[in-house]
Amino acid sequence: MSFSESRHNENCLIQEGALLFCEQAVVAPVSGDLVFRPLKIEVLSKLLAFIDGAGLVDTTYAESDKWVLLSPEFRAIWQDRKRCEYWFLQQIITPSPAFNKVLALLRKSESYWLVGYLLAQSTSGNTMRMLGEDYGVSYTHFRRLCSRALGGKAKSELRNWRMAQSLLNSVEGHENITQLAVNHGYSSPSHFSSEIKELIGVSPRKLSNIIQLADK
């Protein structure tokens, strides 16, 4: 297989199935047939943005290659999203030099940066229109970008993120209901309580009491 980008050319021998990550490169078979299946990397970019946001791995900037070729042991992992995510997490724990290059490529993608931006804004209480203006694109285009990066509707995703973060703080017991509502972008304590109850079936106060009883 031949890779070409600008004036740089490189050949690579592929005897079995392989996974190719590439950025704006021309790929062509030198001999034989090339059978390929495109895969959406937004799932991996999103997962990586969460991991990096939690500070779980070293994100020191590294210059990425224009393409990276991996040969996973089990090709079946790419047939199932959960298997794919599990494989990805395993690789992050003990990354090979080649996989570190994959991470560098993913960190250059717009989906990765957009998910990071949305995570940072998830408790701001800003509307999607306000976020789009801050991001510098039209509301319609911003929704389209978010849908592609998140794999679903951004409004629902942000709502769930905000709920998760506020519940973690509620369970830890560091803030009262009013503080939680203000700090996580809810319009009022009643708005906070009603939304949590709508999403998980119990109020945050009741959930906190249940957890405290379980700890005794």
Curated annotation (Swiss-Prot):
Residues 129-150, 177-200 bind DNA. The keyword Transcription regulation applies. Induction: Transcriptionally activated by HilA. Repressed following invasion of host macrophages. InterPro entries: Homeodomain-like_sf (IPR009057), HTH_AraC (IPR018060), HTH_AraC-typ_CS (IPR018062). Keywords: Activator, DNA-binding, Transcription, Transcription regulation, Virulence. GO terms for molecular function: DNA-binding transcription factor activity; sequence-specific DNA binding. The keyword Transcription applies. PROSITE patterns: HTH_ARAC_FAMILY_1, HTH_ARAC_FAMILY_2. Residues 112-210 form the HTH araC/xylS-type domain. Transcriptional regulator required for the expression of several genes encoding type III secretion system SPI1 effector proteins. The interaction with SicA is necessary for the activation of sigDE (sopB pipC), sicAsipBCDA, and sopE. NCBIfam families: PRK15340.1. This is Invasion protein InvF. It comes from Salmonella typhimurium (strain LT2 / SGSC1412 / ATCC 700720). The gene is invF.
